Design a protein with these regions (language model features):
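Short glycine-enriched loops at secondary-structure junctions
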Residues: 54-55, 126-135, 176-186, 226-232, ...
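Sec-dependent signal peptide cleavage junction
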Residues: 12-27, 840-851
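Catalytic domains of carbohydrate-active enzymes, especially glycoside hydrolases
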Residues: 73-90, 164-178
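Preference for extracellular/luminal or secreted protein segments
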Residues: 25-77, 83, 313, 334-691, ...
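Short, hydrophobic alpha-helical membrane anchors of single-pass surface/secreted proteins
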Residues: 2, 846-858
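Second-shell residues forming the walls of enzyme active-site clefts
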Residues: 37-40, 63-66, 71-74, 96-120, ...
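Hydrophobic faces of well-ordered beta-strands that scaffold small-molecule active sites
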Residues: 46-53, 85-89, 124-130, 177-181, ...
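C-terminal membrane-anchoring or membrane-association module
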Residues: 860-876
C-alpha cells in the first residue's frame, strides 16, 4: 500500500513539477527571468549579438594570424567585457585536428564565464552551419550526403541518423548550436542558393525530414535552427548577393513554404532563422532605405508582420528567432550597419547573426562593436531613439529570457559546472569526430540516396569480368580519388575480377575527341598520355559524371562534354553510364546513355585515401563529400539501388537558362536492384574481438608485459583493424576471415609471452598434502577420481594460467580428497534383490564414484585445454 502511494505521489510530482518535499522546481524560463532581472542594459544587449572571427586577427602589436583557430587575449577580453552571447564558427575556425577545436571553444567559454570581466558570466551559444552535404564546417568531421540526398532515401530514419552524427560531432568539439536544418521547399529548380540543401520540392516530404533531422540533432543536446523563414526555396536570386522577392500570397505560403516550418515548430526546434527576402503581397510595412534613398518593402528579417505577427502570433513559435548574416547584400545594400540591426530587433529578432563584417582586430571592436552597442542603448533609452528607431525594454527582457531559456534547455548554462579537464574533452573529440562508425554510417546514408533514373537492359549493376576496362570521367580532379575509393571498396567486396582495369579522365574545360587529354591517370597512379579518343577506344564501359549548379550549366561543357563522349561510345556499342553529381536536373541531358544515376552532391574538398580501404578509408583529418563514391559503389553493385527523386525534373529549354513546366522525370521516380554482395558471417570476428578486448594486463607480471611490448602493439593494431572491419559494410567473406585470423594469430603470439601473476601457494600446499596419501587405503573408484584431480592440479601448477584456473584446480583437488572412501568402510551388500530389478552391489559407492568421475572428467577436459587456454585470455 505504501509503495503504491509513493508511486502515485511521484507521478503527481512529475506532472505538477513538485519535488517530493513539496517545493516546486524552477522551470528553465523562471531561472532565465531571475537572471535577466539582475542584468544591466548592456549585458542584455550583449546576449543578442553573435560575433564571428573567420577573417584572421591582427593584434595591437601588429602580429597577425590568417585564421582564428585558437583564442587570443584580445578576443578573450572582448567576449568577456561586452557580455557577448553567441559566436558563430566557420570552416576557417576549425582545424582538421578536433582537439584544436576543443581548445578554441573551451577558451571562448572561459572568456564568457570569466567573472572578473562580468558579474553574470553567461556561457556562449557557439554555433555553426553544419547542415551536411555541400554546407559543413568541421573540416575533420563527417560531411554526410546532404538534405536532398536524405530526401531521396525516402526514409526519415536516415535524417535522424544524420542529425545524430552531426550533433555528436558538434557537441564533441564544444559547439552547442547547429544552424540547421534547411527547411526550405525547393520548388524552384533554378534556385541559385538552396538546391541540394533542401530535402524536397514536396512540402510534406520536406516537413517530415525537417522534423526527423531536428530530433536527431537534439538527441545530442545541440540546439537546432530551421531556416530560412518564411521560405527561400522559390527564388532566383541569392540573398548573399542581392535581395530576392517572392510574390506568393499568405495562403500560398501556408500551402507550401510554411509547411516544414510549422513541422519544425511542432517538433520543438530551438531557433528559426530569418530570410533576407521580400514578400510584397504579404507585408504592408514600408521601410526607408537610407542607402538607396527610397521606401521599400522590408525583407522578412526586418518585417514585424512576418516575425511577430505571422511566426509568433499565427504559427505559435515561442523559441529564439535568429537572423541570417546581417552582412549579406540582401540587407547590407539597403541599410547601414546600425540601422539594419536595430530594425531587425524591432521586427522581433532575438539574436543578430554577424551584425557587422567579421571582427579581425581590436580596432574593429572600437569602430564596429562599441558604436552598435551605443546605438542600441540610445534606441532603448532615448525618446527619439537612434535615428528615429526606438526599441522596447520590455521586449528586450522577453527576448533575453528566450535566449537564456534556450541555453538552459540545451545545458549551456551548466557549463560552469563541467568539471572535465581540457584533456578529457579532447579525448572525447578524438573518439567521436570523423570516427569510423560515423563514416560508415555516412557511407550507408549516401548509398541509400543514390537514384537510378534509367537502366536500359539492366546494365546496372555492372557485371565486370577479367576483360572489363572502365573509364571514369569528370570535370574536376577532386573526384579522382572518389572513383578510386569506390573501386577499391568493390574489390574488397569481391566484385572486381583479376584482370579488370580502370583509368580516370579529368577535363576541366571543353575538349574534343581528338584533343590531348586535359589530365588522365592509369590505375597504378601514373599519368596517361594520349587523346580523349584513345581513352574512349580503350574502355569497354564509360562512367561519366556531369555537374550543374544552375540551369544555364546544361548548355556548358560540364554537360556537353559528357554528352559528346557518351554518344561516341554508344556509337561503338560500348556501355555508358551518366552520373548527375550536383543538382539532379541534368539527368534529362543524357538520353543516349544506357544508365543514368543521380547522387545529389559534391564539394571542392579533396579526399585523402589511406592504404586501408575497409573501415579506415579516410585519413583521420579529412571530411569529404561521399556522394560520388556512393554512386559508383551502387553502379558497381557493392550496394543496391533504392533512391527516388525527391524533386520533379522539369524540361530544360535549350539556350535559355530556364526550365519549362513539362516534367521529364517526376518526383518519386527511381529504379531499384539488389546488391551483388552477400552479407559476410562476422561471428568469429566478433568473438575474436571480444577476447582481445577482455585482455586485462594487470593479471600478468610486469616483466612479461614489458617483454611483450611489441607483440602487444601488433595485437592492438590487428584489433583496431578488426573493429573497423566489423563496422564496415559490404565486405567479401575472405576479407573478414583474414581480419579474424590476423587478430587470433597476434593474440596467440602475445599470450605466449605474457605470464599470469598468480598465487599458487595454496595449490602447492594442497598437492604436497595429497602426495602423502596412500592408494591402498582407499577404494579403487574414489582413488581414481582423486588421482586424476591431483594430476590436473600438478599440470596447473606448472602451467601459465590465470588465478581463476588455479583456484578451480585447488577446489577440484580438495573435493576429490574429501570424497575419498577408506577401504572396508563401504556400505554392506543387500542380499535381497531390490524391487523391479537386480541388486547392485556397492550402489551407493558406485553412485558416488560416478559423481566424482564426472567431476574428474569435467576437470580433465578443462586441464587438457590448459596449454591452449593459457595462450588466450578468458572471456568474461
Amino acid at each position: 500500500m505504501i509503495s503504491a502511494m509513493l508511486a502515485l505521489l511521484m507521478s503527481v510530482t512529475a506532472v505538477s513539477g513538485m519535488s517530493v518535499s513539496g517545493v516546486r522546481a524552477q522551470t528553465n524560463e523562471e531561472k532565465a527571468r531571475e537572471i535577466v532581472a539582475d542584468m544591466t542594459l548592456e549585458e542584455k544587449i550583449g546576449q543578442k549579438l553573435m560575433l564571428s572571427f573567420r577573417s584572421g586577427w591582427t593584434m595591437r602589436d601588429g602580429t597577425s594570424v590568417s585564421a582564428v583557430t585558437t583564442i587570443n587575449d584580445e578576443i578573450y577580453d572582448i567576449i568577456g567585457t561586452y557580455d557577448i552571447g553567441s559566436v558563430i564558427l566557420f570552416a576557417a575556425n576549425f582545424d582538421p585536428d578536433a582537439t584544436v577545436n576543443v581548445e578554441l571553444t573551451d577558451g571562448l567559454q572561459r572568456a564568457a564565464m570569466d567573472e572578473s570581466l562580468g558579474k553574470n558570466a553567461i556561457p556562449l551559444m557557439l554555433g555553426a552551419d553544419q547542415e551536411g552535404g555541400i554546407v559543413y564546417r568541421l573540416t575533420g568531421g563527417t560531411a554526410l550526403p546532404g538534405n536532398m540526398a536524405l530526401g531521396a532515401s525516402g526514409d526519415t530514419d536516415n535524417a535522424v541518423m544524420a542529425g545524430e552524427i552531426i550533433g555528436s560531432e558538434l557537441s564533441a568539439v564544444g559547439v552547442n548550436a547547429n544552424f540547421a536544418p534547411d527547411a526550405d521547399v525547393n520548388n524552384n529548380a533554378n534556385n541559385p542558393v538552396i538546391g541540394l540543401r533542401s530535402f524536397s520540392s514536396d512540402p510534406q516530404i520536406a516537413a517530415e525530414f525537417t522534423s526527423a533531422y531536428i530530433a536527431g540533432v537534439q538527441k545530442q543536446n545541440v540546439a537546432t535552427t530551421a531556416k530560412h523563414f518564411p521560405g527561400h526555396g522559390n527564388v532566383s536570386t541569392d540573398s548573399h548577393t542581392g535581395l530576392p522577392s517572392i510574390d506568393s500570397t499568405k495562403e500560398e505560403l501556408y500551402e507550401t513554404e510554411l509547411v516544414p516550418f510549422q513541422a519544425a515548430i511542432d517538433a520543438g526546434t530551438d531557433m528559426i532563422m530569418t530570410a533576407h527576402i521580400q514578400f510584397p503581397n504579404i507585408v504592408t510595412e514600408q521601410l526607408y532605405s537610407s542607402l538607396q534613398d527610397e521606401w521599400m518593402s522590408p525583407p522578412a528579417t526586418m518585417s514585424r508582420e512576418i516575425l511577430t505577427d505571422l511566426l509568433r502570433g499565427e504559427m505559435g513559435f515561442d523559441g529564439v528567432i535568429v537572423t541570417d548574416s546581417m552582412t549579406m547584400d540582401g540587407v547590407a545594400n539597403y541599410f547601414d550597419v546600425n540601422e539594419r540591426n536595430l530594425l531587425a530587433v524591432k521586427a522581433g529578432v532575438d539574436i543578430l547573426d554577424i551584425p557587422f563584417n567579421d571582427m579581425s582586430s581590436w580596432a574593429d571592436m572600437e569602430s564596429k562593436l562599441i558604436p552598435l552597442i551605443d546605438a542600441f542603448v540610445q534606441a532603448y533609452t532615448e525618446e527619439d531613439g537612434y535615428q528615429g528607431i526606438t526599441l522596447s525594454q520590455d521586449e528586450l527582457d522577453e527576448s533575453v529570457v528566450r535566449i537564456l531559456t534556450m541555453k538552459f534547455n540545451r545545458g549551456i548554462m551548466d557549463l560552469a559546472e563541467d568539471e572535465r579537464t581540457l584533456e578529457e574533452k579532447k579525448a572525447v573529440a578524438e573518439e567521436v569526430v570523423g570516427s569510423v562508425v560515423n563514416r560508415e554510417s555516412e557511407r550507408l546514408l549516401s548509398a541509400n540516396a543514390v537514384t537510378v533514373v534509367k537502366n536500359e537492359n539492366d546494365l546496372l549493376p555492372l557485371k565486370l569480368d577479367e576483360h572489363s576496362r572502365v573509364l571514369f570521367a569528370s570535370t574536376y580532379s577532386r573526384n579522382n580519388n572518389r572513383f578510386v575509393l569506390a573501386w577499391e571498396r568493390a574489390k574488397q567486396a569481391g566484385l572486381i575480377p583479376e584482370g579488370a582495369d580502370y583509368k580516370i579522365l579529368q577535363h576541366y574545360n571543353w575538349t574534343g575527341l581528338p584533343d590531348q587529354v586535359n589530365s588522365a591517370i592509369n590505375s597504378d597512379g601514373t599519368n596517361f598520355y594520349g587523346t580523349n579518343q584513345d581513352l574512349l577506344d580503350w574502355c569497354t564501359v564509360l562512367v561519366h559524371a556531369s555537374e550543374i549548379s544552375s540551369a544555364s550549366n546544361i548548355d556548358g561543357y560540364r554537360v556537353t562534354c559528357p554528352q559528346l563522349f557518351i554518344n561516341y561510345c554508344e556509337g561503338l556499342g560500348k556501355d555508358t553510364v551518366a552520373i548527375s553529381l550536383n543538382q539532379p536536373y541534368d539527368v534529362q541531358a543524357f538520353s543516349e546513355a544506357d544508365a543514368i544515376v543521380a547522387v545529389y552532391g559534391t564539394t571542392s574538398a579533396g579526399l585523402d585515401i589511406t592504404e586501408s580501404f575497409g573501415g579506415g578509408t579516410i585519413s583521420a583529418n579529412a571530411a569529404f563529400s561521399p556522394n560520388l563514391t556512393a554512386g559508383v559503389e551502387v553502379i558497381l553493385g557493392t550496394f543496391g539501388a533504392s533512391g527516388k527523386l525527391p524533386v520533379d525534373i522539369p524540361r530544360y529549354i535549350s539556350g535559355t537558362g530556364t526550365y519549362s513546366d513539362e516534367i521529364v522525370y517526376p518526383l518519386g521516380h527511381g529504379l531499384s536492384y539488389d546488391s551483388l554482395v552477400p552479407d559476410p558471417d562476422k561471428q568469429a570476428l566478433q568473438t575474436a574481438i571480444e577476447q582481445a578486448e577482455a585482455l586485462d594486463l594487470s593479471e600478468f607480471t610486469e616483466a612479461s608485459v614489458t617483454a611483450a611490448k611489441e607483440a602487444l602493439a601488433a595485437m592492438n593494431e590487428a584489433l583496431a583493424d578488426a573493429q573497423n572491419t566489423m563496422l564496415t559494410h559490404k565486405l567479401a567473406q575472405s576479407v573478414v576471415d583474414e581480419s579474424t585470423n590476423t587478430l587470433n594469430e597476434r593474440m596467440d603470439a602475445l599470450m605466449e609471452l605474457l605470464v599470469y601473476d598468480t598465487d599458487k601457494s595454496a595449490l602447492s600446499a594442497a598437492i604436497d598434502d595429497a602426495m602423502a596419501l596412500q592408494e591402498e587405503d582407499y577404494t579403487e573408484n574414489t582413488w581414481a577420481a582423486f588421482a586424476q584431480a591431483l594430476a590436473d592440479a600438478k599440470a596447473v601448477l606448472e602451467a601459465n594460467v590465470d588465478q581463476e584456473q588455479v583456484d578451480a584446480a585447488l577446489q577440484a583437488l580438495k573435493d576429490a580428497q574429501a570424497a575419498l572412501t577408506l577401504r572396508g568402510s563401504e556400505a554392506p551388500e543387500d542380499p535381497q534383490p531390490s524391487e523391479g530389478g537386480e541388486n547392485k552391489p556397492d550402489d551407493t559407492e558406485t553412485g558416488a564414484a560416478t559423481g566424482m568421475g564426472l567431476l574428474a572428467a569435467a576437470f580433465l577436459a578443462s586441464a587438457a585445454g590448459v596449454l591452449c587456454l593459457n595462450r588466450r585470455r578468458r572471456t568474461h
